Amino acid sequence: MKKIIVVGSTNVDKVLNVEKYALPGETLAINTYQQSHGGGKGANQAIAAARSGADTTFITKLGNDEDAKMMVKGFKADGMNIDDVITTTDQETGKAYITVDKSGQNSIYVYGGANMAMTPTDVDAHKSAIINADRVIAQLEIPVPAVIEAFKIAKEHGVQTILNPAPAKELPEELLKLTDIITPNESEAATLTGIEVKDETSMLANAKFFFERGIKMVIITVGGRGSFFATPDDHALIPPFPAKVVDTTAAGDTFIGSLASQLEIDLSNIRKAMLYASHASSLTIQVAGAQNSIPTREAILNVINQDQMTKTEIEKQKAQAAAYAAKLVPDHIVLGLGSGTTAAYFVKAINQRINDEHLDIQCVATSVGTEKLAEKLGMRMLDVNTIDQVDLTVDGADVVDHQLNGIKGGGAALLFEKLVADMSKQNIWIVDQSKYTDSLAGHILTIEVIPFGGMGVFRYLKENGYQPEFRFKDNGDILETDSGNYLINIIIPKDADLEKLSIDLKKQTGVVEHGLFLNVCDELIIGGDQIKTIKRSDLS
């Protein structure tokens, strides 16, 4: 069990639920006013750590008022050590006035109160708690000198320090030098470094700024894109977990507190800890409010287990679709082998059938990875340049809509996949149930570009309202396709005309291919205990 000290703010949240934010001079009526909910970044992070099983002590400063009594009662209920809570008669307990719109996004105005009265002397009076901790977490809703004092004590005694630089402000070099781990969100990172957070390249540039100031690990939360971590030797973007957004209040605090409860001091389990924290945040945003929305360890582990069960079921459905498709393949043909995890199931299934039934089937691959797998299995492979056409290609898809239009390219093989698909007399796609959707809007579309013209395409996409991002490998190098090109990801807009988008992209100098596969799939096979097949010829 991690022993965590949180030095930070406590606020009582006054929450307004609004349809939209008022313009200057505008008066709007509201239907809901939630009064006296516990909040404050320090308190939220402490509660998140405690509910995730950490031995948590909270050093905070409260007024001598009813709000303080309510907050302390809540701290006790969560099993936190409150021996180091400080009370003052000079200031009221801090308050936060929060508006939440119908999409769940929030704006927050903070009255510091007793929080802003915390001094280095206050912190020093509770140094024994810090000395005996594994790590100390602090934010910027208390005066910076108090944070510096806490971190000085920690560093003198080998205690790890985590700084959540929120709200963002210019920080003294002294504080940065005392910080082991820093956890800004994307706007806070940009404020501190002057580098806008747009993609993994800019995230890494932000991280290097902090590395140069002695910080050992940087974690940037990037909202719907997930969270990014970097050390001098490693970095990765951890995806978010899909959830219906009700209220984003306390999501970042939940992430930090739950992460701190799970992260080993040597940082060896960073990916696992961040996945845990991402699940915790996904639960938080589904509930209105701050501290009442912070999940327990049991709730987080339950959703993680459900996610693992879902992944297991998805793999089962992939294998079922692949096995069904393998039974449909006729003898004496040239067969196109798709790319990706679902196609790999098919390659193994058709190879088994070729061996069992002594079929005369020759194959072409749509990626180097598929070719290596097929050759390892001893399948008869052809060079695509030596044939005029392919009789049948079986491939997976990233997503398929009800008109059998799809997106491919998540596996970085979209050019070869499209070339073989165009050569094929028939194309069968195999997917699990999660890949079949009403619309391609909102999904990631991959665009393959030549390295020389990549930035020109990137600028075109940005100027036309997309948010393009280059694809990178885990080690930070730009991802190259089997043909040596780069990949750019965009999100398909809600109102996109797919045909027009396809044509417009192909017109751009530097674009080699894109991942929209329109009117290509002849038959879709969806895995499951009851296989579902959809043929283009049956569509109305």
Curated annotation (Swiss-Prot):
Among the GO molecular function terms of this UniProt record, one is: metal ion binding
The UniProt record gives the binding positions of substrate 2 as: 339-342, 395-398, 408-411, 435
Positions bound to K(+): 247, 249, 284, 287, 289, 293
Q: Which SUPFAM superfamilies match?
A: D-ribose-5-phosphate isomerase (RpiA), lid domain, NagB/RpiA/CoA transferase-like, Ribokinase-like
Cofactor(s), by name: Mg(2+)
- Kindly indicate whether the keyword Isomerase belongs to this entry: yes
What is the annotated localization of this protein?
Answer: Cytoplasm
Which EC number applies?
2.7.1.15, 5.3.1.6
List the induction conditions: By elevated hydrostatic pressure.
**Residue ranges, annotated region (Ribokinase):** 1-308
Give the reaction(s) catalysed: D-ribose + ATP = D-ribose 5-phosphate + ADP + H(+); aldehydo-D-ribose 5-phosphate = D-ribulose 5-phosphate
Binding sites annotated in the UniProt record for substrate 1: 253
Q: Which residues bind substrate?
A: 11-13, 39-44, 141
Q: Which Pfam families match?
A: PfkB, Rib_5-P_isom_A
The entry sums up its family as follows: In the N-terminal section; belongs to the carbohydrate kinase PfkB family. Ribokinase subfamily.
Q: What does this protein do?
A: Bifunctional enzyme that catalyzes the phosphorylation of ribose at O-5 in a reaction requiring ATP and magnesium, and the reversible conversion of ribose 5-phosphate to ribulose 5-phosphate.
What NCBIfam families does the record point to? D_ribokin_bact, PRK00702.1, rpiA
State the protein's name: Bifunctional ribokinase/ribose-5-phosphate isomerase A
